[in-house]
Amino acid sequence: MARISFSYLCPASWYFTVPTVSPFLRQRVAFLGLFFISCLLLLMLIIDFRHWSASLPRDRQYERYLARVGELEATDTEDPNLNYGLVVDCGSSGSRIFVYFWPRHNGNPHDLLDIKQMRDRNSQPVVKKIKPGISAMADTPEHASDYLRPLLSFAAAHVPVKKHKETPLYILCTAGMRLLPERKQLAILADLVKDLPLEFDFLFSQSQAEVISGKQEGVYAWIGINFVLGRFDHEDESDAEATQELAAGRRRTVGILDMGGASLQIAYEVPTSTSVLPAKQEEAAKILLAEFNLGCDVQHTEHVYRVYVTTFLGFGGNFARQRYEDLVLNETLNKNRLLGQKTGLSPDNPFLDPCLPVGLTDVVERNSQVLHVRGRGDWVSCRAMLSPLLARSNTSQASLNGIYQSPIDFNNSEFYGFSEFFYCTEDVLRIGGRYHGPTFAKAAQDYCGMAWSVLTQRFKNGLFSSHADEHRLKYQCFKSAWMYQVLHEGFHFPYDYPNLRTAQLVYGREVQWTLGAILYKTRFLPLRDLRQEGVRQAHGSWFRLSFVYNHYLFFACILVVLLAIVLYLLRLRRIHHRQTRASAPLDLLWLEEVVPMMGVQVGP
């Protein structure tokens, strides 16, 4: 096949080539492109941080620290966003009024109101107590409102006047009123409901004055403790005090043990699903279990709790000592009568009490009967003598006095012990805080074995807590044995149970059951703030949505620009390489064809 070709030689001035791209130019273009992209990325990060920093999770432990510090400061009564609430605790020996406050709800339906106790200008808690108890008005119920007037006047002076009409008042009566006949209870409450609104502008209705049961009081105490400890917070946080969480992000709540002078109380959360029980135990469980929702929306179950609560009258430290002395007196006198002995009838032949320090002498009197006792400090024998007072049954699911007890998962639980649980471990033994059974038993046994003269000398030398007195020294041996038996034999706590903490204060303050009461009573108040927040969010939702979309669009544009710069640099590189490969043959062809025409000899 023949090949036809055409050739046309142009003047040298007509020839041109693509200019070579220097490395310096490429570096300059790349530097400018990267600088431009870096500026855009930095601008995007600044905008992103300023827009979303408010919603980023903060250090919850640091926030809680700030909240605790803030609770010790005087309440700013000039703040119009603060709300107030009053709770009157009408007890058996007196009545106290507590003033609480809280800011506007944060708009998160998962959070409760942030209720705190009000503090005056001197940063002291706003609380006032009067005596006697309101039950003293049983025969003159028409004076019940006069009885409470000093408390309400005190509260009215601390709550801003413009807030009175929206400040709820709750009058909750406990042990003293429970002992009165229902007719007298209703007469006292009726006088309060009728007369108090005539003098005070607080938000108060008939349902806000009531006599609460021991079960309700226990539930309120459980709510208050767990609220202060932050156990109702459902965020995922690294708090060393409570890192274990339950299903659906719920944190593990703590149980409470509270031993007073006359009664003993236990309260703890139980699973919603329990094993099938016999009919008799099932009925007992229903009486002792309380299920409630602390959330503001009944449709949401994240704040639904099921709590076992029981109060044991006569199982407090002082009352248990009286029961023990009655037991010793009766058994000793009966034994003397049967065996013809005279133990305890004179100081020379006393009854040797294992629950008193060595050498301590005392006299037990009941009516006309007298028993002389002297301590022998045998803690193990003391525990054995106290076992019958627990009145346990043979069933494994029964605790003190044969009362049904819901199972406790001791491998996944935590308890706080208050009142006598703290006094027994701290006032004399100085081991309050984290409880360890064997350590406590050793310290209690050593104390009981000491001579009374040695103990009194140590007390004079200030070796015990400042709260300790002669009464504590005298009955510490007995109360430590009683506490130990109640905890391990009565409630079946393992002897090496590691998650019990004895305490008097929580974060430096005493937590009253009234805090739990107002938390429960005001649980629906956040609905108002939530509705207002919903309206505000509806107006701003379009802007937030458009901002998010523009945010991602801006980021995509940066990527496109970056890709274009890279492709442009690659294109320049290919052009340069192609130009370099073609330059040598082109120059040679030009020399071979053009130079001979000029009469120049090329080659040898």
UniProtKB/Swiss-Prot annotation:
Pfam families, sorted: GDA1_CD39 (PF01150)
Membrane topology of this protein: Multi-pass membrane protein
Stated family: Belongs to the GDA1/CD39 NTPase family.
Taxonomic source organism: Pongo abelii
EC number of this enzyme: 3.6.1.15
CDD domains for this protein: ASKHA_NBD_NTPDase4-like
Vesicular side: 50-546
Keyword check for Membrane: yes
GO cellular component, one term: cytoplasmic vesicle membrane
Annotated S-S bridges: C448-C477
GO process terms (BP): CTP catabolic process; GTP metabolic process; nucleobase-containing small molecule catabolic process; UDP catabolic process; UTP catabolic process
Primary subcellular site in the record, as a coarse category: membrane
Active-site residue numbers: E217
Biological role stated in the UniProt entry: Catalyzes the hydrolysis of nucleoside triphosphates and diphosphates in a calcium- or magnesium-dependent manner. Preferentially hydrolyzes nucleoside 5'-triphosphates, with substrate preference for UTP > GTP > CTP. Hydrolyzes ATP and nucleoside diphosphates only to a minor extent.
Gene: ENTPD7
Protein name according to UniProt: Ectonucleoside triphosphate diphosphohydrolase 7
Keyword field: Calcium, Cytoplasmic vesicle, Disulfide bond, Glycoprotein, Hydrolase, Magnesium, Membrane, Metal-binding, Transmembrane, Transmembrane helix
